Design a protein with these regions (language model features):
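Conserved glycine-rich Rossmann-like NAD(P)H-binding loop of the short-chain dehydrogenase/reductase
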Residues: 24-38
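Substrate-binding pocket helix/loop in short-chain dehydrogenase/reductase
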Residues: 84-85, 89-94
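Active-site helix of classical SDR
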Residues: 108, 144
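Alpha-helical segment proximal to the catalytic Tyr-Lys
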Residues: 113, 157-161
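Residue(s) in the substrate-gating loop at a strand-loop-helix junction
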Residues: 128
Length: 167
């Protein structure tokens, strides 16, 4: 049985991904800071903050030890802030990048070693049309998703020789 990890899988797009993986016979782990409001039978929740490298490392180690493989990682965790750049606090902008971009980086970095050990895998990074369109009053969301797009392209080339596909 293949194993899928979905970050931010407790609601919305992430929850839909979890359900689709279940339908297709995957063992599914959902990583989020909070327990899901809606429990999905068959989805194993692990409390994890994607901005905390130790938290991510421990979660992935547990999943790999329990399941013997990590075949797909869906980097879905993220959020958006709205407002004019001139009124946005630096701490808010940094938090946006911490979750949307650095969370994606931390999770990808930590899963690659397991995928290399098993001879391949797939990393899916969720982005947004806001990345190329740079939506007014969502500058930091747009910028964080544009950074995810660049990371995705660079990482895809780095790990291609190890049969790891990134999109």
């Amino acid at each position: 049985m293949k194993t899928a990890i979905v970050t931010g899988g407790s609601s919305g797009i992430g929850l839909s991904c979890c359900r689709k993986f279940l339908e297709n016979g995957y063992r599914v782990y959902e990583l989020s800071r909070r327990e899901p409001k809606i429990q999905t039978v068959g989805v194993k929740h692990i409390s994890c903050d994607v901005t905390d490298e130790h938290s991510v490392s421990e979660a992935f180690k547990k999943i790999y030890n329990d399941s013997g493989s990590i075949d797909i990682l869906v980097n879905n965790a993220g959020f958006g802030i709205s407002g004019a750049v001139e009124f946005t606090e630096l701490a808010e902008a940094k938090k946006q990048f911490d979750v949307n971009f650095f969370g994606c980086f931390i999770c990808s970095k930590n899963v690659i070693k397991y995928m290399r050990l098993q001879g391949g895998g797939r990393i899916v990074n969720l982005s947004s049309l806001a990345a190329p369109l740079a939506i007014p009053f969502q500058a930091f969301y747009s910028a964080s998703k544009a950074a995810v797009n660049s990371l995705t392209l660079a990482l895809a080339n780095e790990v291609r020789p190890f049969n790891i596909k990134v999109c």
